[in-house]
Amino acid sequence: MAGRFFDNVMPDFVKEKESVSGGDTLRNLLAMPYSSLSQQLKRSALDLKETVVIETWGFSGQTVEDFTLYSGTLGAAFLLFRAYQVTGNANDLSLCLEIVKACDTASASSGDVTFLCGRAGVCGLGAVAAKLSGEEDLLNYYLGQFRLIRLSSDLPNELLYGRVGYLWACLFINKYIGKETLSSDTIREVAQEIIKEGRSMAKKGSSPLMFEWYGKRYWGAAHGLAGIMHVLMDVQLKPDEAEDVKGTLKYMIKNRFPSGNYPASEEDKKKDILVHWCHGAPGIALTLGKAAEVFGEREFLEASAAAAEVVWNRGLLKRVGICHGISGNAYVFLALYRATGRSEYLYRAKAFASFLLDRGPKLLSKGEMHGGDSPYSLFEGVAGMAYLFLDMVDPSEARFPGYEL
């Protein structure tokens, strides 16, 4: 597969028509009324959901090798959870809990503590699903297990394996179960440790906060500044801490590439290559949009919109997934649509989703699009595409899984 992305030859805007037929099938999807397209996406999502469950749960004999939400079986449970939210089908919630139970057993001895790649994801999703299904004993069990998670002193701070990945799980639980289910003192303690380490590492540079993961100072959502700032903005910060978060994001804006894209790390400031959620403009655009909401400063919204232009032009990736694929990049436009109400952003999300709906299966089967090392997983594979399609049913409720609350 030469090149990282498909040339985006889709029109900047296509007016919707009540009746479309013949000609280019992708163009027809772009012209289809949103209400009709969203139902088509929903049907495709539910079909994909069944395939994902069969491939990750049925064919495995209901055994779990990789329990994580990112690349493993818990991702299927999270997709079922989202399907339940969209359709109200209680069978999806029941199966979600069944899969979480198996993941609970498989992860019992895991030292990983985050939502996406660790024990907190299992216990967090288990608690929320149990709450929604009215199973009080099971809810208390998962909350009890969550409270047993301990953060080591040498834990990194990033989203996939570090402190903010644990913190996000706390916030997820409190959103669905109740504000003080996990105490604000617990959350503050973790946030303060993150800020303390960020300030310590930043002493030699221009950014108020800086973090390191395996020897590199990453900027992106998965391992770096964008992901850490994003989660911290959902926590009650002291004024000086909030200023440091704001200043860190302004440092990133000031040091972006002329193209509007962002370096993957401090060490990669000359490499304008990646346009992924994990590294580059997409994940950072989501964080800047969040900053506009939290701080009320137009600079952040303008920077998010500029990053979205990069995603539109270079983000039609030759990968399907949420982490580094088209599915994840579509969330940039959904977030900006929520923030601005501008139809052009909904159209762009619709365009990326329509491209996947129309051409994704064929491109995957021909090897012209990469399905990821775990092809049915949430963050690398087609489960992420199904999740996006479900989120397209009601764009006002769309949230990047494991990142936006």
UniProtKB/Swiss-Prot annotation:
Signal sequence region = none
Q: Which InterPro entries match?
A: 6hp_glycosidase-like_sf, LANC-like, LanC-like_prot_euk
Q: What are the record's GO terms for cellular component?
A: extrinsic component of membrane
Q: Which GO terms describe its biological process?
A: carbohydrate metabolic process; peptide modification
Q: Which UniProt keywords apply?
A: Metal-binding, Zinc
Q: Which residues bind Zn(2+)?
A: C278, C323, H324
Gene Ontology MF term list: metal ion binding
Consequences of knocking out this gene:
No visible phenotype under normal growth conditions.
* Presence of keyword Signal: no
Checking CDD domains in the record gives: euk_LANCL
The answer to whether the entry has keyword Nucleotide-binding is no
Q: What does the protein in this record do?
A: May play a role in signaling. May be not involved in abscisic acid (ABA) signaling.
Q: Which family does it belong to?
A: Belongs to the LanC-like protein family.
What name does the UniProt record give this protein? LanC-like protein GCL2
Native source species? Arabidopsis thaliana
> Where is the organism placed in the taxonomic lineage, from the top?
Eukaryota, Viridiplantae, Streptophyta, Embryophyta, Tracheophyta
